[in-house]
Amino acid sequence: FAVVYLAYSMVWELGIYASGFAMDGVVELLLAQFGAVLALFATYFSLKKVRTLPSSGLGFTIRGRGKDVIGGILVATLLYSFGFGISCFAGWIQVESFQWPWKSILTTWLLFFLVAVYEETLLRGIVLGKLLDSGMSKLVALVLSSLLFSVLHLLNPHFSCLPFANLFLAGVMLGASYVYTRNLWFPISLHWFWNWLQGPVLGYGVSGIKIDEPALTIRFSGPEMLSGSSFGFEGTLLCTILMIIVTGVIIGRCRQIYR
């Protein structure tokens, strides 16, 4: 299973790289991602019958999890409010114009929801879930699944050491709650709005991928590790700091609730 989906994910990354997020390619990407989600679920339920996947299930129980969805959205919003605000104040980015291309905004909103469902189901629901079910410690399982999450982005444009480290930290941040709750709604909503706010709304690249019609057009100043001009906000030291803080808060909160 892991080999098949590692190969599939690499093909998916190449497809994004080839077509970009231009509007004439977004619909195709949306359909392709929808197909990927369907294939993932079909494979999971087929292989679950032979006990090769997490016995605990994927983590899509929705009852009582509305606060997790809201929480993930709020965390992403607050993180980018601080990150974008600090970057503007420091002069690393400047807003040049604003528009609201509703078709692009809506389509990418749906696209990044499917991306979040796919990646969180695969990396957290299946990979991390299987590692935890095997008796592996929470820390080791979280580290291994986060490394895989970062490796799956190796083919993205402008990938380098800092984006690798930050995507690893993003994997830890997204998986931190799952090791306690075994539920995906918080990481899905956080991942969803993380990507959507970063690219289509604020005008950064998303993991190195340029967004064609963002709401904000921004100009970058200073070195890449401060401005995120090539890879996006995920390629900045400020992102590193904020993710470490957010991850610490998530783990601390989960330890309080799920003792």
Where do the protein language model's features map onto the residues?
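Membrane-embedded alpha-helical segments of multi-pass membrane proteins
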Residues: 30-42, 102-110, 118, 122, ...
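Membrane-interface helix/loop boundary segments of multi-pass membrane proteins
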Residues: 118-144, 176-183
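N-terminal, membrane-interfacial amphipathic/helix-forming hydrophobic leader that caps
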Residues: 1-54, 199-259
